[in-house]
Amino acid sequence: MNLIMTLFINITLTSLLVLIAFWLPQLNIYTEKTSPYECGFDPMGSARMPFSMKFFLVAITFLLFDLEIALLLPLPWATQTVNLTTMLTTALLLISLLAVSLAYEWTEKGLEWTE
């Protein structure tokens, strides 16, 4: 009974919020807010505009470090495992890989935007 009541309340609240958001008018409508690009690029301009290669290298570096950090996020729950030494070894390996790759990027000047 509690599950059905919770489900009913959640569906009702969700439907109510969607209806309110749909029927209320948007107050601040201007071109900067309605544009899907908020990063300074002109969406109606040329699609063949060249980008700096440094931009892509920094973006890929960010994605790799972000992925490694996402792999470290479940570590607090992994401390409850039976084989604690394997978990600690894996965590230490990931952290050292992160530190070594950061040092490599730093020495190769991959983190500097201007040359």
Swiss-Prot record:
GO terms for cellular component: mitochondrial inner membrane; NADH dehydrogenase complex. InterPro entries: NADH_UbQ/plastoQ_OxRdtase_su3, NDAH_ubi_oxred_su3_sf. GO terms for biological process: mitochondrial electron transport, NADH to ubiquinone. Gene3D superfamilies: NADH:ubiquinone/plastoquinone oxidoreductase, chain 3. It is a multi-pass membrane protein. One of its GO terms (molecular function) is NADH dehydrogenase (ubiquinone) activity. It catalyses: a ubiquinone + NADH + 5 H(+)(in) = a ubiquinol + NAD(+) + 4 H(+)(out). Keywords: Electron transport, Membrane, Mitochondrion, Mitochondrion inner membrane, NAD, Respiratory chain, Translocase, Transmembrane, Transmembrane helix, Transport, Ubiquinone. The chain crosses the membrane at residues 3-23, 55-75, 84-104. It is found in: Mitochondrion inner membrane. The keyword Ligase does not apply. Its EC number is 7.1.1.2. Belongs to the complex I subunit 3 family. Core subunit of respiratory chain NADH dehydrogenase (Complex I) which is composed of 45 different subunits. Interacts with TMEM186. Interacts with TMEM242. PANTHER family: NADH-UBIQUINONE OXIDOREDUCTASE CHAIN 3 (PTHR11058:SF9). Core subunit of the mitochondrial membrane respiratory chain NADH dehydrogenase (Complex I) which catalyzes electron transfer from NADH through the respiratory chain, using ubiquinone as an electron acceptor. Essential for the catalytic activity of complex I. This is NADH-ubiquinone oxidoreductase chain 3. It comes from Ailurus fulgens (Himalayan red panda).
